[in-house]
């Protein structure tokens, strides 16, 4: 699986504050006020824990793998590659769309 450099640059070192799975939408809020929404088909792992620091994001077509500094991971299948992830900063400005 290749590292998604653009998404990794946007969220690397951000710390998870809250993790919610609402139907097919995964919401991750970070302690700095930024947030990520991912439209998923399924989630294949336990949720990220509060306080987890994002190390990198890898992707292979419909698979997205979040890797954290504490070695925890989140493996999800996205619905529409290139159109399933949005990351916004604390001012609600889009930093990543894909």
Residue ranges of model-derived segments:
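Surface-exposed, interaction-prone regions used to assemble/regulate multi-protein complexes
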Residues: 1-98
């Amino acid at each position: 699986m290749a590292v998604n450099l653009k998404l990794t640059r946007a969220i690397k070192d951000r710390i998870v504050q809250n993790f919610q799975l609402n139907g097919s939408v995964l919401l991750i809020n970070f302690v700095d006020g930024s947030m990520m929404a991912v439209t998923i088909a399924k989630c294949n792992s336990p949720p990220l824990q509060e306080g987890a620091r994002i190390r990198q994001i890898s992707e292979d077509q419909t698979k997205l793998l979040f890797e954290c500094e504490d070695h925890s991971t989140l493996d999800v299948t996205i619905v529409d590659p290139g159109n399933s992830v949005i990351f916004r900063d604390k001012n609600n400005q889009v930093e990543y769309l894909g």
